[in-house]
Amino acid sequence: GWYLRNDIIWAKNNPMPEAVKDRFAKAHEHIFLLSKSPKYKFFYEEVLEPYTEPLNRWGGDNFNDAGQEQTKYGEGLAKELGYSHQNKDGKGKNVRPNPNGRTRKDVWKLNTSSYAGAHFAVFPDTIPELAIKAGTEQGDIVLDPFMGSGTTAVMATRLGRKWMGIEMNEEYAEIIKDRTSQLEMF
């Protein structure tokens, strides 16, 4: 079996229009993060997102005379995190938990993409890019069981991963051949 680790929502900023009158028009898709075991690779630092402006005001950029970032945290925690406790006037700022960004949320607001000759539901490159960075290391193999237009294969190659894919639709398989033949493989 599989373990469901995340049910990520892809909230489409520009969904295909639907002429429906008995329900709301669909503007999202589910992306499932599955693992084969309870312990699995997840490289969250590879997919951090920038802090929002309110969080930027909340923390960071308060340095002492030695150039060390300062915080209002207690002295012990500040030292453990590598920050000085406060500046010379006794005031500090709360320092962001991770200076590289914050943990990505499970709702991704992204536009759909297009590829000449491809079907309507082309993922933006960002979706497989985030999944590949979060779950694999360079040289790993990425499996795409529903290749569509081959976006995951393209991103896997760009990120230094090998890939295998399955696509039953012959028209899409031709698109995949065209897209992947242009890639510089290992």
Model-inferred region functions:
Residues 1-180, 185:
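Core catalytic lobe of class I
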